[in-house]
């Protein structure tokens, strides 16, 4: 190929192989941030559900740039994060082969939403006896001593403590009834403090505001949109063949040499596209808060210092194919993996960011709450009524 006078780099990334369907529907955390025992005891991850996207307007703080102190428009993603429920803790010991599970302690009362996750078909299962034997330990003195002994053993021998928490899917407008379960590592403080923190939060809810904060960088772990079986043009981005090519254009002409007499794994082939497990690092939190009031008070989560309109984060008519966000939410810069309603795992950033963009404090000037179905650019129902007037069908008869 020495006669070539143009570049022809390979198409497609070999860093994500095999390109097959993910084994789990939710994002799996394979590593947590490094523990700093000088900090206060805290959780390092949470779970949420993708609601949809909108856009915001803000002033860019980037000295030296032509856009410094000028307005820019950015896309943001809204992730609804109902409170998570803590039901247990796991202690890990360090071995030559890595971390190994030492002991697991469960809470006394476990909801059916959590127990559904342990069954392939909860409806057809006749027994539903999961944890019935374990829970009886809390009813006897010997059982309580056994649980206390397990906690003491974890405090003495374990180096890593993680709580077991599950989402409350019944609070969302989803057809799913099985809760998503997640192990969340507890960082900060000594092992004794971590175990005491976990036990004190048994059968209690944890809010996302207690885990993350505004202007913080987090990692988003999830499964991408599924595209099904696709060809090499869409799957790998290779070049189409010339128009007069025999037996098809959207193919790879040469799939390798005669010998070795097998097709190399680096050759683009047709197959599964999408529904892959992916991790997106360092997504910035632009806003965090409660979407709708719980006690009847007015909450203006869509309000800014420059836009004083009383409105929530929800667009008119709700998010398309999702509905209204009612619980706590995160507003992240850019897009994240997966379709609407997809369960996402949110983790504190593994890497420490010291760049100017990472340390920039975000001040939003405007949050778009217009209809995502294409019904005009009106931000609230009052604006739309003021512009169009009262409809004839809604006007009262004299």
Swiss-Prot record:
One of its GO terms (cellular component) is extracellular matrix. GO terms for molecular function: RNA binding; structural constituent of ribosome. Residues 1-10 have a biased composition (Basic and acidic residues). One of its GO terms (biological process) is translation. PROSITE patterns: RIBOSOMAL_L3. It is found in: Cytoplasm. Keywords: Cytoplasm, Ribonucleoprotein, Ribosomal protein. Residues 1-34 are annotated as: Disordered. InterPro entries: L3_arc_euk, Ribosomal_L3_dom_3_arc_sf, Ribosomal_uL3, Ribosomal_uL3_CS, Transl_B-barrel_sf. Residues 17-28 have a biased composition (Basic residues). It holds the Pfam family Ribosomal_L3. The L3 protein is a component of the large subunit of cytoplasmic ribosomes. Belongs to the universal ribosomal protein uL3 family. This is Large ribosomal subunit protein uL3. It comes from Dictyostelium discoideum.
